[in-house]
C-alpha cells in the first residue's frame, strides 16, 4: 500500500486551495450574468460568500507554497526552475492584487478588469505550478 507523506498532504492541500481560488472564479463567471439579470442584492451576497471561501483558500495556497519552498534548496535547482518558480509566485501575487482591485473597485472597468486578471493570473500560476511539479 502507498503511504502518504507530509509532501503528499502539502501538495494535496495546495492544489485543492488553488482549485477553490481559480475554479470558483470560473464558476462565478458562468453564474454572475444570470444573477445580474435578477436581484442585484443577490449578486452582492454571492460575491461576499465567495470571498469568505476564496480568500481562506488563497491563504492556504500561500502557506503551503511557502512550506514547499522551505522544503527545497532553491539554490541547488536549475536556473530554469528558479525562473519558473519566480514567475509563478509573481502571477499568484498579481492574481491576489487583481482580486483586491476587483473587490474594492467601484467602476465596471475595475470590476471587469480586476476579475479577468484575477482569473488569468491564477490560471497562469496553476499551470506554472504543474510545470514545476512535472519537470522543467
Residues of each region from the PLM?
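Polytopic transmembrane helical bundles with strong interfacial aromatic enrichment
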Residues: 1-136
Amino acid at each position: 500500500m502507498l503511504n502518504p507523506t507530509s509532501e503528499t498532504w502539502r501538495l494535496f492541500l495546495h492544489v485543492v486551495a488553488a482549485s477553490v481560488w481559480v475554479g470558483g472564479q470560473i464558476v462565478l463567471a458562468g453564474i454572475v450574468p444570470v444573477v445580474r439579470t435578477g436581484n442585484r442584492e443577490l449578486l452582492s451576497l454571492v460575491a461576499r460568500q465567495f470571498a469568505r471561501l476564496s480568500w481562506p483558500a488563497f491563504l492556504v495556497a500561500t502557506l503551503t507554497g511557502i512550506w514547499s519552498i522551505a522544503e527545497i534548496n532553491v539554490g541547488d535547482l536549475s536556473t530554469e526552475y528558479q525562473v519558473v518558480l519566480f514567475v509563478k509566485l509573481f502571477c499568484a501575487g498579481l492574481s491576489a492584487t487583481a482580486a483586491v482591485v476587483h473587490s474594492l473597485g467601484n467602476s465596471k472597468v475595475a470590476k471587469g478588469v480586476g476579475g479577468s486578471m484575477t482569473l488569468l493570473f491564477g490560471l497562469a500560476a496553476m499551470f506554472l505550478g504543474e510545470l514545476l511539479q512535472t519537470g522543467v
